[in-house]
């Protein structure tokens, strides 16, 4: 299949997003869509110039192929649209399998640690100077490492393959790296035998080698009698690895057997992390035939994998993706190995079917913590099932059910109570937002004086930037109604805007942009946050570029833009006459009148993201 136009559904997720970026690197015209936005993956898509379009055909694109997350179910409006256009629809795994079918493919599979091990293989190959492509199932902590990359000059591609939806059956790898295997996904597989059969068939389709951890009885049984070599990794494996030293953040590994005899230092600690690193080094050696002196020198970890969000003497707050009893048990062992003090876990079960299947195992795994708080189940679109609620996890134990997440911060504060502790937020749902909120809370509590906006921006704003407290908003609207803004700013430069938005993020402070305030209703009790106003004198400049083109600032008033266009002899702007407001606001809502729309006259847009990055895209990248 040659490169063409593709529409990726569920593009802000950790499975589809990286694949979209990989396809873009291969030369495809890629657009995406997701019902849920705000994911960190959205920034990666923007960096790769992949627009989110509700209807790519309406934007002038003609995707003949649609890739979808398995979470996008039949009957979804986007799928119905794709089918009505005659597009071919593939699940994420099926599409990835087609793209790597003619490549030398390294498949990373297993129940736990796929993303971490895959990321470590990428880091090890990068450290060895290898040329290759990859597709991760998450985000690197290192912002310089994108979640996917295509290589036009190398046949090698590394990616994790997902067993949860059966698409693992579409792959025929050169090298298969099986990190482990436990019973999981009872919503898809009838029993363990079904799951094992899928992995056995994958091993049988593998063309060069299968890599497994030494001593794993289940994987030994499933790889018995294969026609390709089975390479074992561990203290007694073909690739011998033995930890000989280390601390809470690093490990010294002694390598031997199929490895060159040497010692290497890797930036990981704990039994599970060392095992993942060993598997990654073995896979990199199979591909390159060598081991770099600093094999994981680029390794900074994976987001939501033992991700430390806050730390001060006596308290550490972290988030982890663990959502299976084995993963939780491994995480808690790592916490005991690398942290002193009490271990407090906040667990959000993922999917009702998994919760029902493993309620007792979750209860047992959580018992390794000093305290366990259990949140309501994150359904991931599943309907509730009997016995699939969080109540089944806490039943008959000392674990505490937190039914209202608003009560969580006070519950944690009472448990921490000035004693040395680590607080781990655990789960594959949206518990990360609770973790980030609690980390922000601790940063505020830890300050000698609770800071407010002026404290964080002092000395960092331009002299021309206005920042005022308790600003009346009634005079900022055409209706002349409403209360005051807690903070009001008129930034003079892009740097001013970035500084203000980052301070709001640190303070967990809401913000809102007001233009002319046309038909804007402000509550009588005002706005408890920051109101930003882009004054037209600084942000409304209009520059003629010739050939019927204008460069216009977002603060320009539409009436003035229409008048200037008339003076320049430019047609097509007449519909703007009589529309109140500024250009920025009109772009936000695709303002129009008399059969004309603002995007009819737009060539491209440059804007600032909430994270402070300057973005630019052409008209067909917008869902307008």
Give, region by region, the residue ranges found by the protein language model.
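Anion-binding (especially nucleotide phosphate/pyrophosphate-binding) glycine-rich loop
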Residues: 452-583
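Short beta-strand "acidic-cap" motif of Rossmann-like dinucleotide-binding folds
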Residues: 29-34, 133-134, 232, 513, ...
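A gly/ser-rich beta-alpha-beta helix-loop segment of oxidoreductase catalytic cores
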Residues: 109, 562-568, 572-603, 609
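Phosphate-binding loop of NTP-binding sites
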Residues: 22-25, 70, 74-214, 218-229, ...
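Residue-level signal for inorganic ion chemistry
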Residues: 23, 66, 108, 132, ...
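ATP-dependent carboxylate-amine ligase
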Residues: 1-52, 62-66, 74, 84-87, ...
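Glycine-rich beta-strand-to-loop/alpha-helix junction loops that act as flexible
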Residues: 69-71, 214, 425-430, 514-518, ...
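Structural signature of FAD isoalloxazine-binding scaffolds in flavoprotein oxidoreductases
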Residues: 489-494, 521-539, 588-618
């Amino acid at each position: 299949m040659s490169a063409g136009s593709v529409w990726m559904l569920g593009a802000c997720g950790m499975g589809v997003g990286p694949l979209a970026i990989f396809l873009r690197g291969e030369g495809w015209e890629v657009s995406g869509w997701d019902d849920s936005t705000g994911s960190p993956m959205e920034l990666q898509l923007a960096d790769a110039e992949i627009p989110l379009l509700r209807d790519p055909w309406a934007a002038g694109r003609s995707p003949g192929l649609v890739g979808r997350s398995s979470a996008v179910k039949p009957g979804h409006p986007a799928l119905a649209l794709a089918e009505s256009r005659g597009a071919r629809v593939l699940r994420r795994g099926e599409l990835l399998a087609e793209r790597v079918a003619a490549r030398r493919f390294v498949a990373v599979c297993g129940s736990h640690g796929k993303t971490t091990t895959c990321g470590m293989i990428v880091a090890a190959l990068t450290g060895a100077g290898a040329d290759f492509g990859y597709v991760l199932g998450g985000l690197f902590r290192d912002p310089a490492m994108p979640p996917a990359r295509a290589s036009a000059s190398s046949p090698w591609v590394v990616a994790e393959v997902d067993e949860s939806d059966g698409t693992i059956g579409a792959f025929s790898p050169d090298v298969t790296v099986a990190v482990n295997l436990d019973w999981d996904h009872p919503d898809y597989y009838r029993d363990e035998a079904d799951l094992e059969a899928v992995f056995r068939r994958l091993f049988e389709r593998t063309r060069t080698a299968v890599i497994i951890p030494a001593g794993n009885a289940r994987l030994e049984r499933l790889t018995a009698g294969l026609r390709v070599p089975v390479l074992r990794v561990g203290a007694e494996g073909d690739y011998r690895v033995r930890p000989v030293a280390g601390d809470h953040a690093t490990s010294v590994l002694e390598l031997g057997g199929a490895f060159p005899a040497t010692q290497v230092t890797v930036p990981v600690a704990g039994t599970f992390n060392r095992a993942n690193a060993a598997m990654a080094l073995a896979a990199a050696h199979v591909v390159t035939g060598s081991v770099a002196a600093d094999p994981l020198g680029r390794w900074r970890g994976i987001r939501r994998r033992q991700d430390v969000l806050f730390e001060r003497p006596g308290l550490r707050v972290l988030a982890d993706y663990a959502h299976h009893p084995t993963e939780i048990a491994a995480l808690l062992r790592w916490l005991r190995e690398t942290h002193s003090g009490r271990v407090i876990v906040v667990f959000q079960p993922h999917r009702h079917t998994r919760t029902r299947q493993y309620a007792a195992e979750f209860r047992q795994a959580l018992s390794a913590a000093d305290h366990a708080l259990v949140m309501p189940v994150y359904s991931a679109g599943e309907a509730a099932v009997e016995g699939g609620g969080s109540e089944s996890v806490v039943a008959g134990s000392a674990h505490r059910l937190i039914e209202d997440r608003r009560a969580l911060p006070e519950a944690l504060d009472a448990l921490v109570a000035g004693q040395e502790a680590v607080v781990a937020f655990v789960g594959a749902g949206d518990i990360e937002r609770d973790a980030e909120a609690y980390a922000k809370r601790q940063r505020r509590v830890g300050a000698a004086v609770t800071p407010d906006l002026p404290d964080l921006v002092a000395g960092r704003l331009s002299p021309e930037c206005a920042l005022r407290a308790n600003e009346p908003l009634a005079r900022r609207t055409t209706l002349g109604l409403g209360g005051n803004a807690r903070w009001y700013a008129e930034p003079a430069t892009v740097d001013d805007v970035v500084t203000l938005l980052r301070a709001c993020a640190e303070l967990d402070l809401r913000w809102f942009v007001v233009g002319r305030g046309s038909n804007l209703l402000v509550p009588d009790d005002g706005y408890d946050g920051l109101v930003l106003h882009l004054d037209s004198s600084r942000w409304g400049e209009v520059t003629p570029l010739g050939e019927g083109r204008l460069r216009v600032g977002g603060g320009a008033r539409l009436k003035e833009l229409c008048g200037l266009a008339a003076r320049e002899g430019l047609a097509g702007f007449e519909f703007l006459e009589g529309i109140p407001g500024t250009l920025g606001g009109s772009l936000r809502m695709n303002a129009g009148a008399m059969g004309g729309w603002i995007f009819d006259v737009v060539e491209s847009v440059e804007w600032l993201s909430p994270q402070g990055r300057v973005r630019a895209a052409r008209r067909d990248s917008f869902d307008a």
